[in-house]
């Protein structure tokens, strides 16, 4: 198992965004996390959920603290991941969610 977080790609971002993370059209992508991560490190993974399915994972390249949410003014961390990531051939049902959740990668196939 490989430690990381799960992030849901909003439906408003569309299938095109979900595909771009894994098809080679991007070299990196930015996710946001409220506050400062207590357990997350460079080299861990962001597991992506789209339309209530775990579709893949991307390795974390950098954690950039000190950003501010423009809507709330609260601190957040930018999570830069390497793309393309590893896409599952057969997505796994996984309920989408708001925010960030830590995971041991238990849903990732061995």
Give a label for each model feature.
Residues 64-80:
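Short, solvent-exposed secondary-structure boundary/capping segments
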Residues 59, 80-82:
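Short, well-ordered beta-strand micro-motif
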Residues 44-49:
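Short conserved beta-strand and strand-loop elements enriched in small hydrophobics
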Residues 55-66:
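Short beta-strand-centered aromatic/proline hotspots
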Residues 1-42, 75-77, 85-110:
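Compositionally biased, charged N-terminal/linker segments
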């Amino acid at each position: 198992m490989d430690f990381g977080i799960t992030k849901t790609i909003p439906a408003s971002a569309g299938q095109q965004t979900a595909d771009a993370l894994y098809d080679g059209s991007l070299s990196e992508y930015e996710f946001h996390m409220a506050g400062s991560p207590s357990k997350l490190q460079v080299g861990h993974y962001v597991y992506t959920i789209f339309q209530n399915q775990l579709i893949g994972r991307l390795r974390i390249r950098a954690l950039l603290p000190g950003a501010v949410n423009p809507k709330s003014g609260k601190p957040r961390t930018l999570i830069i991941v390497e793309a393309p990531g590893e896409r599952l051939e057969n997505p796994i049902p996984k309920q989408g969610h708001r925010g960030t959740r830590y995971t041991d990668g238990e849903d990732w196939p061995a």
